[in-house]
Amino acid sequence: MARRDMAAETMDPRASTEPSPNEPREPARYDHAAVEPRWQRAWEEGETFRAVRSADPARGKRYVLDMFPYPSGSGLHVGHPEGYTATDIMSRYFRMRGIDVLHVMGWDAFGLPAEQHALETGTHPADTTARNIATFKRQLKMLGFSYDWSRELSTTDPRYVRWTQWIFLQLFKKGLAYQDEVSVNWCPALGTVLANEEVIDGKSERGSHPVYRTPLRQWMLRITAYADRLAEDLRLLDWPEGTVAMQRSWIGRSEGALITFEVKGWGKGALSVFTTRPDTLMGVTYVVLAPEHPLTTWLTSAESGASEPRREAVRAYVAAAAGKSDRERLAAAAREKTGVDTGLVAVHPITGVEVPIWVADYVLGGYGTGAVMAVPGHDERDFSFARTYGLPIVEVVSPDGSLHDQLEAAYVDPGVAVRSGEFDGLATEECKRAVIARLEALGRGKREVNYKLRDWVFSRQRYWGEPIPIYFPVELADPQGDPRKGAAHTIRYDQPIAVDEASLPIELPPLADFRPGDDPAGPLARAVDWRFFQRDGKWYARETNTMPQWAGSCWYYLRFLDPQNDAEPFSEAAYDAWMPVDLYVGGAEHGVLHLLYARFWHKVLYDLGHVKHPEPFAKLVHQGMILGEDNEKMSKSRGNVINPDDIVRAHGADVLRMYEMFMGPLEAVKPWQSGQIQGVVRFRDRVFATCTRPLSDAMDDATSRQLHRTIKKVTGDIEGMAFNTAISAMMVFVNHLSSLPSPPREAVLRLILLVSPFAPHLAEELWRLTGHERSLSYEPWPTYDEAFCVDDVLEIPVQVNGKVRGRVMLAKAASEEEARAAALGLETVAALAAGKQLKKFIYVAGKIVNIVVG
């Protein structure tokens, strides 16, 4: 079947979405269990939300995207739909504003969690993933989200894997994907490398297995080549300030100097250190190496000529450091610093003075050069270490140029150079420039920009991930041997070969035993018939490491543009139609890794000419976490997880949607409170009852003013994603309409449209019951007349026993009797006053209503 160009379709998604006209039109009550599935079927059968880009550029477009979920075995809990509901409200609102909308959903289905779940349940991850996706999809459809399901994708789909591997090959060809021996947290029991965050007290967070620091061959992505642009282009984005700050900190750009110290007795002659304070160079009293530094490794060998006791002391210290993660090392160093004297000395690049070289684990091999020049007078870590081991502490920067014989603490602020020879008297910034100039003249240093950001360790020694599309030559001891049958061989990892693009995707073999082992080659090494192959009489071996879970999520927003395209990842027409992503919503926990990696891949594709924008996500919003009723994070272990199926069964999807939006600001952390759901149920039922009463063709001035004020308020709040206050405004308006003998038809119809993004099933049903035959999904959004909004009607807070319990709309000239009737008509007030004596009623005109009951 020919591929459909999704950017150019012209079908009318509004057609044929109404339920059968034979269904009852005047129900006595609102039955969510019957109404909601009926409208979900109507939307699906009519393809109501199929994304269609109009040929009219005046319509505009919005690409509204959720961070797609990892489909876990437990399905959704009520915290998951919060962000999805927010994007659905925005998508429905944009459609009604006449804007073309792309709103899609897919599955981030590869990775360690899926594989561990499969191992624990004794099933294959392909089977568990398929079941989990089915559960998630059922739940999302149950909640009435307006996704274009024709674009659904999964990162495990071979058609998707093909293009993930294709992007890797572009990175490889550009020199951005390479192999290196790096020190990693290796867990033999889990059979994979762990991040620092996954190691606690030398053991894995999952399963408490021993973890060791060891060098392993890894595939790396050269994200550092894009460090400057990743930092600079943050200014282009409408993102939360906290997330921008996190990314800047993670990238960690710093300016300083790279300085060379000669090492006596070392064959390589010198080591380099980076410092942001070259002005303190004259205060160096020792140099510190990370346990992983090549000089440290050389020192433990017989080649170094060091005494056996000295070598053994260094060897033991390095071994102890290998059992700790970087995080543990830094935490331990904050309490008590440890180290060992190597017996080697470094030569100061300007004075020629010899200073001792130590090994200490507060210096990390993965940061900077893995060596630091220690200036204890002006660095707190160095000061503590020098105090512990009796090393000299020299003041070379003074606040005002005066000298101090003894320092009680490191002075770390700018000042004036002292005891610095030719640099004495120079202010800090001037001294930095002078020291760098002197080093450059001597050929022993230069100005340098450094980053905390490290290249991305990309490979995983697990089964459930995208195979890396690389293979290597195999050298056989016996030319007639077969490596699949155990013939002695050597794999030439130093000669990586890219898989031909026409051969993609390279799919995972159906491996029955995919358990990890202590072999760093990973489980795929056991699939010998898959791993080894012959071509032109020569043997080759496939790469057996797989990609991390981050790979598929780095570019999924692009595949959504054109998911059925088998000729390219996405067409230019599809890209031009929808990119960039206008609104991206997801958890703040992804503020660094996923978002940084996706930006990196996008910039590579930008440089290669495949995309036309330097950044993929124009606006980013983080929804706040919904806690359990115990104010703790929802988890099965705490027993505080609330299943959305139960809420929908009892009250309906619209109630769940509105309750989650009414709980508080979208970005706020908030606890689930089951007792408050009934208030939203009453609001829904009151909307239904009000809109199904006999309607009037006339509208009084007070209702007209309140209608226009409500439209303005709800419109502005949706634009600002302040959904809780939008719902509150509608509640106030419904209270007003319900007090009328016969609500105006015009006001009711506009109310239905206002409610529809929040409670779409209810709105569709009411739209049908008020005589409309087609879905309201593309009806024009209500407009307001500013003249009706600037008048003498005010929103007045109502206090009961000192606490604000609601708000009423009153004219400035309203009498106390009118204020009393409006305030006591509020549900919340009536409930609090029920069965109690009204002791006091105070109305401050235009300001507040205060009620005291007891």
From Swiss-Prot:
- What Enzyme Commission number does this protein have? 6.1.1.4
* Family annotation (SUPFAM superfamilies): Anticodon-binding domain of a subclass of class I aminoacyl-tRNA synthetases (SSF47323), Nucleotidylyl transferase (SSF52374), ValRS/IleRS/LeuRS editing domain (SSF50677)
What gene is this protein translated from? leuS
Sequence motif 'KMSKS' region, location on chain: 633-637
Q: Which CDD domains match?
A: Anticodon_Ia_Leu_BEm
Instruction: Give the subcellular location.
Output: Cytoplasm
Q: Which family does it belong to?
A: Belongs to the class-I aminoacyl-tRNA synthetase family.
Q: Where is this region: Disordered?
A: 1-32
**Which named protein is this?**
Leucine--tRNA ligase
* Motif ('HIGH' region) on chain: 69-80
| Gene3D superfamilies for this protein | 3.10.20.590, HUPs, Isoleucyl-tRNA Synthetase, Domain 1
Q: Which organism is it from?
A: Sorangium cellulosum (strain So ce56)
Q: Where is the composition biased (Basic and acidic residues)?
A: 23-32
Position of the signal peptide: none
Which residues are ATP-binding? 636
Molecular function terms in GO for this entry? Answer: aminoacyl-tRNA deacylase activity; ATP binding; leucine-tRNA ligase activity
Q: Quick one: a GO cellular component term?
A: cytoplasm
